[in-house]
Curated annotation (Swiss-Prot):
It comes from Oryza sativa subsp. japonica (Rice). It catalyses: 2 a ubiquinol + O2 = 2 a ubiquinone + 2 H2O. Its EC number is 1.10.3.11. Its main location: mitochondrion. This is Ubiquinol oxidase 1b, mitochondrial.
Length: 335
């Protein structure tokens, strides 16, 4: 009987703590407050006083912050305060205008990146393969042209989209590897890093232009993804093994590009493809007249490809003659 009464008493005391929704530590804290010594009860108040004093010190420091730091602090607390971040870092996007006074709307290139294409270049030039490496490069490109022609046939815009996604790879790979070599060997590059990166950027602008002419379908995007992934890695390895062969290969690849754009122009002149107005991005990039057409755009792009052809054959010739690229000035700005 006595044990039953003791159990009931224990349950009455522990029940609220074991089965209440309120956490146990809050109940224990409430019980502890009743037996807390006077000195201990003062401690929370002292801590609160210290926190308050610290807050006052921080507020005073914030008031004394230099103006840029205060601006950054305001930007951190206000995500929409974009101008404060720009002002703090000292970077202000320039407001550019064209020659006619209208606002420059392109972010990927600036007025000083534009140029007038030299369309007088000979688009019929061809490098006769000499020796096994040249013949291997030539016939590799020719073998790739067969499935390309069967797949695209006369769909020139689709072909151009795929071509430009691949054509922008060699310049980037070559420029990157020459850049790393320059850093690794503590030597100059002869300007070839910049020349090859200019080529890659120019090819990318061709792609941006054709995206204004047509949008790729899902299967074309998948094809581009596969082709670019394979070609980048293959060209990377090829350039490491033999830069001479790699540049010769690209020279022949650019010859095929010139030939493809020549066929494009023939169909435009024959009326098989509508000669639509030129995209605005092409007019600004190549400084074309306001009434330029698609034919004018294809003409300047073909001229660009011919210049890339010459540059890569020239780079291969330099190395074929036993010289190094860094010892021969690169044709920077060769358009």
């Amino acid at each position: 009987m006595s044990s039953r009464m003791a159990g009931a008493t224990l349950l009455r005391h522990l029940g609220p703590r074991l089965f209440a929704a309120e956490p146990v530590y809050s109940g224990l804290a409430a019980s502890a407050r009743g037996v807390m010594p006077a000195a201990a009860r003062i401690f929370p108040a002292r801590m609160a006083s210290t926190s308050s004093a610290g807050a006052d010190v921080k507020e005073g420091a914030a008031e004394k912050l230099p103006e840029p730091a205060a601006t950054a602090a305001a930007a951190a607390t206000d995500p929409q305060n974009k101008k404060a971040v720009v002002s703090y870092w000292g970077i202000q996007p320039p407001k550019l205008v064209k020659e006619d006074g209208t606002e420059w709307k392109w972010l990927s290139f600036r007025p000083w990146d534009t140029y007038t294409s030299d369309t007088s270049i000979d688009v019929t030039k061809h490098h006769e393969p000499k020796g096994l490496p040249d013949k291997l490069a030539y016939w590799t490109v020719r073998s790739l042209a067969v499935p390309r022609d069967l797949f695209f046939q006369r769909r020139h815009a689709s072909h151009a989209l795929l071509l430009e996604t691949v054509a922008g790879v060699p310049g980037m790979v070559g420029g990157m590897l020459l850049h790393l070599r320059s850093l690794r060997r503590f030597e100059q590059s002869g300007g070839w890093i910049r020349a090859l990166l200019e080529e890659a950027e120019n090819e990318r602008m061709h792609l941006m232009t054709f995206l204004e002419v047509m949008q790729p379908r899902w299967w074309e995007r998948a094809l581009v993804l596969a082709a670019q992934g394979v070609f980048f890695n293959a060209y990377f390895v090829g350039y490491l093994v033999s830069p001479k062969f790699a540049h010769r290969f690209v020279g022949y690849l650019e010859e095929e590009a010139v030939s493809s754009y020549t066929e494009y122009l023939k169909d435009l002149e024959a009326g098989k493809i509508e000669n639509t107005p030129a995209p605005a991005i092409a007019i600004d990039y190549w400084r074309l007249p306001a009434d330029a057409t698609l034919k004018d755009v294809v003409t300047v792009i073909r001229a660009d490809e011919a210049h890339h052809r010459d540059l890569n054959h020239f780079a291969s010739d330099i190395q074929q003659q036993g010289m190094k690229l860094k010892d021969t000035p690169a044709p920077i700005g060769y358009h």
